[in-house]
């Protein structure tokens, strides 16, 4: 499981009711938002706030430049950094894929590290069943494809990835007798 939340990305291999291998990194949605703000300052000379950067992330957020269904470009307005005059810029998903590249690569490296340290007996199960993506970051266009291409294991976006962790926690709390390992 790879859960890309706001503050952290959690990568975990779970087997037979237990946590086998895991990693946690502070590269996640909040960093993506900051990446977008920085990119707009550097490439478009425009300053945007966190809320606007979030809107851009949801509207045209992508991690690969070639998508089957391309979103419409996002028009952003803000002050020019030099003159403070209002300016407008059209932002494409290709630009966002470019500006998120380094952060996504950090997550890929963490996934590879977890897989490298996973016992070989479990590795074949992972290859057979794939890896599930959850959290808001899982909604970035092209993420499952990029990870699949990088790791050569199929990645799947969980149903309702924004709430998957909360639903799983609720289920575990309903059936604590089956999930005692979670209560440690």
Which role does the model predict for each range below?
Residues 99-127, 172-176:
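Phosphate/ATP-binding catalytic cores across multiple sugar-kinase/actin-like superfamilies
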Residues 49, 53, 68, 171-184:
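Acidic, glycine/GT-rich loop-and beta-edge segments that sit at the periphery of enzyme/chaperone cores
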Residues 16-101, 112:
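Phosphate-binding glycine-rich/basic clefts of nucleotide- and phosphate-handling proteins
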Residues 3, 36, 111, 133, ...:
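Residue-level signature of catalytic and energy-coupling elements of molecular machines
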Residues 18-20, 124-129, 151-154:
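Short, surface-exposed connector motifs at secondary-structure boundaries
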Residues 145-171, 179-184:
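Conserved phosphate-binding/catalytic loops in two-lobed NTP-binding clefts
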Residues 1-21, 68, 141:
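Gly/Thr-rich phosphate-binding beta-strand-loop-beta motif of the actin/hexokinase/Hsp70
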Residues 123-147:
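Glycine-rich phosphate-binding loops at beta-strand->alpha-helix junctions
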């Amino acid at each position: 499981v790879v859960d890309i939340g706001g503050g952290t990305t959690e990568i975990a291999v779970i087997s037979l009711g237990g946590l086998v291998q895991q990693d946690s990194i502070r590269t996640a949605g909040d960093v993506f938002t900051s990446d977008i703000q920085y990119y707009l300052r550097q490439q478009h000379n425009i300053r945007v706030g966190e809320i606007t950067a979030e809107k851009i992330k949801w509207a045209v957020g992508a991690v690969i430049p070639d998508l089957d269904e391309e979103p419409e470009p996002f028009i952003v307005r803000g002050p020019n950094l030099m003159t403070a005059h209002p300016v407008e810029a059209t932002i494409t998903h290709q630009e966002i894929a470019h500006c998120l590249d380094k952060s996504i690569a950090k997550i890929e490296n963490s996934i590879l590290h977890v897989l490298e340290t996973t016992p070989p007996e479990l590795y074949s199960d992972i290859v057979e069943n794939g890896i599930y993506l959850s959290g808001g970051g899982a909604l970035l266009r092209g993420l499952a494809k990029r990870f699949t291409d990088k790791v050569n294991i199929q990645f799947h976006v969980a149903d309702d990835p924004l709430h998957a962790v909360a639903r799983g926690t609720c289920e575990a709390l309903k059936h604590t007798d089956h999930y005692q390992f979670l209560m440690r």
